[in-house]
């Protein structure tokens, strides 16, 4: 009996990954369903949140090890500070009877000096004007990926960025599966959505709604 073995090594014969990457610090994972949305406002699948969790940082997160679960700050400087009000708008004590509480206001402060990942959208010229905010088909002729842009930039994360995302939940052209639920807890969210729908109907030739032009009582800076 003669057996001829060639190319024997310590790796599995059906390893789908390149051999030159075997010693690198790379984590491979799989998902059962292709992600449909990487927009946190529209996303509703755990398969999508595998990616979203590596892209976006919320103000709070759960402690990785503690059980029962415990919230800890992530981009926030600390846990939210709650202020309680009765139905007349009067401030209540911290130990007030829950039956007397009509609404709660949470104050969240965001850590300073958190920067966005460098991206062409933030790139500016010497005079401070954005380089790529007026792109047309001709300017995009030789652009196939983000790395094809010559310049990138960044900026600080601001509290108003989170407020903007909350507003997007009821944008007339964006579907958010949790908008109805959140409207029960965020003051004025339904009315805000109705106002955006009016702006959507009234706009002429533009597909852009300035969310900063409309105030949302339940989320302010």
What are these regions (language model features)?
Residues 78-178:
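Aromatic- and charge-enriched surface segment that lines or borders ligand/interaction sites
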Residues 4-7:
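C-terminal motif of bacterial Sec signal peptides marking the signal peptidase cleavage site
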Residues 9-15:
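Bacterial lipoprotein signal-peptidase II cleavage site
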Residues 29-98:
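N-terminal lobe/hinge region of extracytoplasmic solute-binding protein
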Residues 145-221:
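Surface-exposed binding/hinge segments that line
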Residues 23-34, 104-109, 162:
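Short, well-ordered beta-strand elements
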Residues 22-26, 54-56, 74-76, 101-105, ...:
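Extracytoplasmic
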